[in-house]
Amino acid sequence: MLGVGMAAAVLLGAVALLLADAAARRAHWWYREAAEAVLVGAVALVVVDAAARRAHGWYREAALGAARRARLPPGEMGWPLVGGMWAFLRAFKSGKPDAFIASFVRRFGRTGVYRSFMFSSPTVLVTTAEGCKQVLMDDDAFVTGWPKATVALVGPRSFVAMPYDEHRRIRKLTAAPINGFDALTGYLPFIDRTVTSSLRAWADHGGSVEFLTELRRMTFKIIVQIFLGGADQATTRALERSYTELNYGMRAMAINLPGFAYRGALRARRRLVAVLQGVLDERRAARAKGVSGGGVDMMDRLIEAQDERGRHLDDDEIIDVLVMYLNAGHESSGHITMWATVFLQENPDMFARAKAEQEAIMRSIPSSQRGLTLRDFRKMEYLSQVIDETLRLVNISFVSFRQATRDVFVNGYLIPKGWKVQLWYRSVHMDPQVYPDPTKFDPSRWEGHSPRAGTFLAFGLGARLCPGNDLAKLEISVFLHHFLLGYKLARTNPRCRVRYLPHPRPVDNCLAKITRVGS
């Protein structure tokens, strides 16, 4: 019986081995077939990818002819419809904003100009100071070329969409009331009161606040006062929320479907226009009854303004100008103020030097003078260097848009008539050949340094230089003056990740505690 059992066991073992062998062979065959299928699929994807890119490039460039195509900058159009947008968004959303242009440099060399397909248009990316200067200073060869989706948000009668002659007309009417010496002198007391009361409130709060959120509210309150003569807190908050939503859609893909940032931005634009139209209607009705605002705020000045031909601005022009300026006042000043404060707090030697300058200026003020004057702020040389370095390093406006009106050569490469041009200010500001050790915050690099045209583009260049630059710098200077003399900032998450779209900011909005310090 034992022998029979042993034989049965051997037989069962043999059968098991045969089954295992068959299963192993089948599995190997399946694995080999699957691997081959994956390999074939991968090859097919590569072929399809290359074919789609080549076909898209041919479609966009065929009309140029062989001679003009040969003079194009290096680069590629990428996939149809998408082009370089996925790479652009991936770089910025992954926290590596310089990786987008770096990929062109790595693949095509350091030529300073590259071709791509961005925001639904064939586009040339200009990344050098010399190239940006050439484009920005040539108003005959280049006109404003912002994407249609952006124009729909900011407004067709705003500076980003106006032709040169109309831009010059509107700028002339609005420049003095915004950046003029008398205008800034008039704005200073309100800016000062708003800053000091805000700092006191944050310190009295005792706990942590979202520093960036509070700064944006503060700067928006200032800009609403300047442009609309103020508004109640509920209206100001509603406007501020709408501008926040508007900005999230500015550099998003223009997908007008539920759940996408661009659709929300369009809704925000409609709300803003409705509010501003309501205020404008009230002003015009009051004037019709003989009750004039007397030019006490920017809206009154825009209503009253007329050019040398006696032409007044219409409602659409006034509203789009206000949308543009209010947005700039809401975003730029608040972000730069936050980063300048953070950079100073992180660098005690720089903080001490900036504070010493403010203390020296305070000692020089006559006892008969109440508060600081505009001339006092223009003596703050080191603080100005801090602000310029923050503007360079943070890159609030990292890119600008133009369109070629004729065939133009930049850096020896052709930009065809009708093509879009992106001016990458960020690449200029982060170029080690222009700014050694560019990722370092170093205000001293500005001592005795007058930047060459095209190397510092925080406010643009040429005829379309940002018309509110002096107002923005005044707001930032007033805040830093009071902060340096009486407060300190302790961040809750000092190593917090930075989000770069639509503007660089910590993901926690710089959660921090603000406390008073002794004099």
From Swiss-Prot:
Cysteine disulfide partners in this protein: none
Classification via Gene3D superfamilies: Cytochrome P450
EC identifiers of the protein: 1.14.-.-
Any single GO CC term annotated in Swiss-Prot or TrEMBL for this entry: membrane
Topological type in the membrane: Single-pass membrane protein
Tissue: Expressed in roots, developing leaves, the vegetative meristem, and suspension culture cells.
Subcellular location: Membrane
Xref: PROSITE patterns: CYTOCHROME_P450
UniProt-listed GO biological process terms: gibberellin biosynthetic process; pollen tube development
Residues involved in heme binding: 466
Pathway, per record: Plant hormone biosynthesis; gibberellin biosynthesis
One MF term in the entry's GO annotations: heme binding
TM annotation in the entry: 1-21
Main location: membrane
Cofactor(s), by name: heme
Pfam family, one: p450
SUPFAM superfamilies: Cytochrome P450
Family, similarity comment: Belongs to the cytochrome P450 family.
Protein name per UniProt: Cytochrome P450 88A1
Species of the source: Zea mays (Maize)
Gene name tied to this protein: CYP88A1
